[in-house]
Amino acid sequence: MAVPKRKMSRSNTRHRRSQWKAAVPTLVACERCHEPKLQHIACPSCGTYNKRQVLEV
């Protein structure tokens, strides 16, 4: 198993960890009600997905 030869400094550790960022979710406008919603998920305000009513709202 690979083992670090030297202790990594706090600065280097934090610099490496700073690259791990949460991705910003992509919002699109709903085709029916034009409210912002997540892609590939039913619209929470009108309940449609792919031009079909899938949720009772």
UniProtKB/Swiss-Prot annotation:
The keyword Ribosomal protein applies. GO terms for molecular function: structural constituent of ribosome. It holds the Pfam family Ribosomal_L32p. GO terms for cellular component: large ribosomal subunit. Keywords: Ribonucleoprotein, Ribosomal protein. One of its GO terms (biological process) is translation. Belongs to the bacterial ribosomal protein bL32 family. This is Large ribosomal subunit protein bL32. The gene is rpmF.
